[in-house]
Amino acid sequence: MSTAETPQQPQQQQKLRWGIAWIYSSSNNTIITITDLTGAETVARVSGGMVVRADKDKPSPWAAMQAAYKAAQLALARGINAVHIKVRGPGGYGMKVPGPGASAAIRALARSGLVIGRIEDVTPIPHDTIRPPSGRKGRRV
């Protein structure tokens, strides 16, 4: 008896084109920028204020989710189908943690069909003290 083996054909895998999704999330707005790997060319830039009507809705997680969906669609149309995510908060004098829209934007990017690589927090944190804007002796009223 002869056993005829069928040659297995390799599955065609889609070539991944990587980009970087920069998510800046503060207590006032969420801005999502998708660039190429070098960061030189901006592929898509959408903010929470571009997808909502009222200013009070800009920092909401819903606005961040809609902005992330829109940015992902623009990136997929330009050929980028995989991203590394870099999340940033205000830092410096502001909050050292990202705002309320950061996690919602990450979830939306994952659900939109983009392949997620690394997720990194790049909030600028001072390692010494920073002088307050009011100066050395404080604000005199």
From Swiss-Prot:
* Record Gene3D superfamilies: Ribosomal protein S11
The lineage's top-level taxon is Archaea
Q: Which Pfam families does the entry link to? A: Ribosomal_S11 (PF00411)
Signal peptide residue numbers: none
Return one Gene Ontology term, BP aspect.
Answer: translation
Chain segments annotated as transmembrane:
none
One of the record's GO cellular component terms:
ribosome
Show the PROSITE patterns listed in the entry: RIBOSOMAL_S11
SUPFAM superfamilies this protein is in?
Answer: Translational machinery components (SSF53137)
> What NCBIfam families does the record point to?
arch_S11P, PRK09607.1
User: What does the protein in this record do?
Assistant: Located on the platform of the 30S subunit.
Assembly:
Part of the 30S ribosomal subunit.
What family is it from? Belongs to the universal ribosomal protein uS11 family.
Q: Which PANTHER family match?
A: 40S RIBOSOMAL PROTEIN S14/30S RIBOSOMAL PROTEIN S11 (PTHR11759)
This chain's protein is named: Small ribosomal subunit protein uS11
